[in-house]
């Protein structure tokens, strides 16, 4: 029999400016792999934070949460603050004790600490090796790539086999092989897991979908593809129902109009008969009174039917989620021709890849490929810091725009509008608000501190700001730009990249996203 890991009831989160969700009710079961899906800004990450740490001053929620098992949490941002791998795994004291025992410098406390723990070092090594991470527990975390840091943070959680896991976009920054590793580890984690994700591949392997929208949360027992099929069928049925109610309402209004027209015609005929004197006045008055009573009855019935049909139409329309289309394009003001970038035997001291060559013409788009930690982000960062001139390794003749993985161009404590103003002071707050509205960041959200936005909303704001930089940009350097975005917003960004007439170097581990960008050329970095 399936046992409940967590029971959630009447969960609501309301801010002065916005209600994120209200009266959510659902259960999470042990030994099951479940995912929470939904558009950016609905509060998915907030749900994970609340479930993990119920006393949160910045999230004034209401509701009841009851845990039956220990649980652990992976944040969407700030995943690691450790100095070494041992510290990141949470085993630093135990590891140090084993080290002192190995060199013959142990104390009584060291032997006491390691009692019944002798199997642990082998487990640590196995976990790190399977994740393709350095197995030296003294290795500095600062030297790891973002993808490697994500895997290390996940390893720390997978070591807690009795903990139910709450994971916020766990596949962000992971390369293809690392995503397969993640899927395998999630499937084999004994206690179960509940994660937020927009990763189609990862969502295909879940057993339970919790879909969050403006109406609440819906639990469906299936994977993502099956959910999409069921949801599409349901939405089409609701749309047909709403259209049918609309047709019936129109027909009732037409009938009401015809009834009124017939009544007016009869009244005109009665006036004509009265004037002609062909019928007695008493008889005409009697007929008029009867007709008036009959018309009043019919009109009352028709009005009642109209009100009922309006109510049915309103109810059917309210069941449909009203989603305004988003709009975003990359600005491109001039056309460059010829070669804009040439790289010859490039290699940096901190990268693992072999020296490589690269030539890029104006308008070219390429996919920069390679495993986690090989140096893709390092290369993009180096390019972004290279001035438009020749060096011994790089010739660059255009301005570049660089989007890093951590959205470091914006200040967490400043408001959204204040952050955007830093990119271009000539753009008015009204114009910024209009542009934000096209990305579904509306109303008072523009005045919130940047850190109060969801991960996807933060990325949208960053893209918008970068897009309004004053110098004309001819080369976009995009480091996993799809991270944090919901599936619909990923499609919007892919379309913007595809239609951008300048050049693009894209780092991404999402094959579906790369294909949607229309990028067919690639450069593979190898060790």
Protein language model annotation of sequence segments:
Residues 2-11, 95-147, 230-349:
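Coupling and communication elements adjacent to P-loop NTPase active sites across diverse families
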Residues 8-11, 19-32, 63, 343-361, ...:
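Conserved beta-strand
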Residues 24-42, 190-191, 356-371, 502:
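Pre-Walker A (P-loop) beta-loop-beta motif of ABC nucleotide-binding domains
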Residues 33, 46-111, 362-431, 509, ...:
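ABC ATPase nucleotide-binding domain signature region
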Residues 78-146, 405-474:
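ABC-family P-loop ATPase nucleotide-binding domains
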Residues 146-166, 384-386, 456-478, 493:
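GG-anchored amphipathic helix commonly corresponding to the ABC/SMC/Rad50 NBD signature/C-loop
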Residues 167-170, 177, 449, 477-481, ...:
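Walker B catalytic motif
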Residues 205-222, 509, 515-527:
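H-loop (His-switch) and adjacent beta-strand-loop-beta switch element
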């Amino acid at each position: 029999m399936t046992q409940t890991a967590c029971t959630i009831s009447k969960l609501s989160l309301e801010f002065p400016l916005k209600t994120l969700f209200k009266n959510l009710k659902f259960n999470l079961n042990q030994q099951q792999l479940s995912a929470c899906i939904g558009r950016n800004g609905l509060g998915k990450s907030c749900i994970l934070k609340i479930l993990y740490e119920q006393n949160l001053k910045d999230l004034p929620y209401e509701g009841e949460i009851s845990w039956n098992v220990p649980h652990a949490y992976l944040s969407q941002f700030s995943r690691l603050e450790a100095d070494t791998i041992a510290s990141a795994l949470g085993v630093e004291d135990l590891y140090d004790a084993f080290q002192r025992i190995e060199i013959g410098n142990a104390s009584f406390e060291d032997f006491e600490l390691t009692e019944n723990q002798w199997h642990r070092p082998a487990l640590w090594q196995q976990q790190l090796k399977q994740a393709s991470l350095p197995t030296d527990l003294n290795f500095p975390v600062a030297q790891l790539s973002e993808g490697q840091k994500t895997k290390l943070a996940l390893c720390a959680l997978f070591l807690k086999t009795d903990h139910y896991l709450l994971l916020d976009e766990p596949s962000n920054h992971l390369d293809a092989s690392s995503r397969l590793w993640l899927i395998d580890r999630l499937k084999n984690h004994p206690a179960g897991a509940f994660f937020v994700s927009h990763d189609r591949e990862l969502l295909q392997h879940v057993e339970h979908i919790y879909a969050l929208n403006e109406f609440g949360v819906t639990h469906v027992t299936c994977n993502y593809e099956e959910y999409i099929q069921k949801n599409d069928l349901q939405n089409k049925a609701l749309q047909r129902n709403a259209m049918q109610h609309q047709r019936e309402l129109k027909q009732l209004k037409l009938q009401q109009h015809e009834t009124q027209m017939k009544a007016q015609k009869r009244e005109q005929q009665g006036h004509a008969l009265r004037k002609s004197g062909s019928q007695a006045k008493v008889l005409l008055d009697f007929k008029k009174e009867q007709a008036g009573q009959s018309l009043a009855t019919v009109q009352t019935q028709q009005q009642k039917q109209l009100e009922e049909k309006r109510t049915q139409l309103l109810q059917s329309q309210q069941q449909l989620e009203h989603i305004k289309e988003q709009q975003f394009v990359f600005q491109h003001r001039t056309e460059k021709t010829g070669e804009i970038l040439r790289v010859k035997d490039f290699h940096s001291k901190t990268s693992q890849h072999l020296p490589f060559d690269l030539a890029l013409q104006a308008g070219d788009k390429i996919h920069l490929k390679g495993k986690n930690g090989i140096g893709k982000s390092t290369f993009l960062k180096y390019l972004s810091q290279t001035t438009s001139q020749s060096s011994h390794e790089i010739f660059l003749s255009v301005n570049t725009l660089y989007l890093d993985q951590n959205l470091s161009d914006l200040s967490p404590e400043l408001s959204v509008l204040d952050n955007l103003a830093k990119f271009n002071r000539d753009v008015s707050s009204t114009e910024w608000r209009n542009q934000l509205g096209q990305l579904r960041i509306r109303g008072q959200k523009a005045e919130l501190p940047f850190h109060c936005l969801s991960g996807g909303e933060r990325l949208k704001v960053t893209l918008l700001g970068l897009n309004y930089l004053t110098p004309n940009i001819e080369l976009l350097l995009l480091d996993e730009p799809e991270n944090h975005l919901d599936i619909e917003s990923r499609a919007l960004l892919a379309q913007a990249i595809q239609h951008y007439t300048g050049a693009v170097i894209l780092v991404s581990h999402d094959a579906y996203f790369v294909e949607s960008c229309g990028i067919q050329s690639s450069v593979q970095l190898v060790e």
